[in-house]
A protein has these predicted regions:
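Short, linear, compositionally biased motifs with a strong N-terminal bias
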Residues: 11-14
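Bacterial N-terminal signal peptides that target proteins for export
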Residues: 1-9
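N-terminal leader/targeting pre-sequences
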Residues: 6, 16-159
Length: 159
């Protein structure tokens, strides 16, 4: 009988240890806003970042996007300020405060009514996004044919 209690105790201790080491699910939701000459404009939707032990999902829900139906890019930008800046010539750069594009996270499909409801799963962690911005751009990178076009930030979620 004493052996049974020892085995049960060991199994209980192991299960507690495994549970304590399991990665907690982290979910953060931020507003997606339109970028304009004043910085952040009207809200068009939300982006939810969920980090689990199996990876990170980025769920985009938006309506009223002012782009043609089809593909747009979702990118990670280095800063979290939607404020416009000026270039060397003094021209206004909408979204200039976002800094540099740090990477393409995938493409989103915009419906004919300007809506998006899509989830992208990647290997990012929330710590990779914190203090930065998720940006919807008007173009997607085409790595298959080695072409990259100029991407204009249109909508942003500040983290």
């Amino acid at each position: 009988m004493n052996k049974i209690f020892k085995v049960l105790f060991m199994l209980s201790a192991l299960s507690l240890l495994c549970f304590a080491q399991a990665k907690q699910t982290t979910t953060i939701t931020k507003d997606i806003v339109e970028l304009n000459e004043n910085g952040a404009g009207k809200k068009v939707g939300t982006v939810t970042v969920t980090e689990t032990a199996n990876g990170t999902s980025i769920s985009v829900e938006a309506t009223g996007l002012k782009v043609d139906a089809g593909q747009v890019g979702l990118h990670l930008y280095e800063k979290n300020s939607p404020k416009p800046t000026k270039d060397k010539s003094g021209n206004l750069v909408i979204g200039g405060g976002l800094g540099e594009d740090m990477g393409d996270l995938g493409s989103l499909t915009v419906n004919g009514d300007g809506s998006v409801s899509q989830t992208i799963v990647g290997e990012l962690e929330y710590s990779d996004i914190k203090g930065k911005s998720l940006v919807i751009t008007d173009d997607v990178n085409s790595y298959a044919d080695n072409t990259q076009t100029k991407k204009e930030p249109l909508y942003v979620a500040i983290f």
